[in-house]
């Protein structure tokens, strides 16, 4: 039987604990994109949970944001898969295509740290991986997904889009 917590709607608060297991995140992702690389999705789901737990950040939100920012790992914009940039960090235009990271783990850590800069005033617990962390001011300016609209991204519906992904994730 699935625990009641597993069926609960994920929190929209950034500095909160995620409730989804890696296998639930994987099942959600594969339901959305059945032809995705399941091993990559499995690795990323585990990394998001681990890295988010280090920083006290909601892994459900971070994973959902990765899905939104990468088009469910299809990429296709300024960021390419080999950049290990799962959240559009530094991507502005053709002259500023975004930050490049050496590994999936480093890219996930940078994403979690950048999300922490928006969602919390607490100091980082892990070594800095996010080259843009210092530019987020004031720290904690977006305590939930809705407050990311117009700040993390210029899209005024950004928070609604993230909440929509979290709602779909709630079934897993």
Task: Write out the residue ranges for each language-model feature.
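Catalytic cores of secreted/periplasmic lytic hydrolases that degrade extracellular macromolecules
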Residues: 1-172
């Amino acid at each position: 039987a699935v625990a009641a917590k597993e069926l609960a709607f994920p929190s929209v608060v950034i500095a909160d604990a995620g409730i989804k297991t890696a296998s639930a995140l994987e099942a959600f992702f594969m339901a959305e994109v059945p032809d995705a690389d399941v091993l990559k999705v499995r690795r990323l789901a585990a990394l998001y949970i681990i890295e988010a737990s280090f920083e006290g950040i909601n892994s459900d939100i971070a994973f959902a944001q990765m899905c939104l920012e990468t088009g469910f790992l299809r990429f296709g914009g300024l960021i390419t898969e080999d950049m290990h940039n799962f959240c559009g960090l530094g991507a502005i235009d053709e002259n500023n295509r975004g930050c490049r990271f050496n590994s999936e783990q480093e890219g996930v850590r940078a994403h979690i740290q950048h999300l922490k800069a928006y969602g919390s005033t607490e100091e980082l617990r892990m070594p800095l991986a996010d080259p843009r962390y210092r530019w987020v001011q004031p720290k904690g300016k977006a305590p939930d997904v809705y407050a990311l609209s117009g700040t993390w991204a210029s899209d005024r519906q950004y928070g609604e889009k993230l909440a929509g992904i979290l709602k779909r994730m709630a079934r897993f």
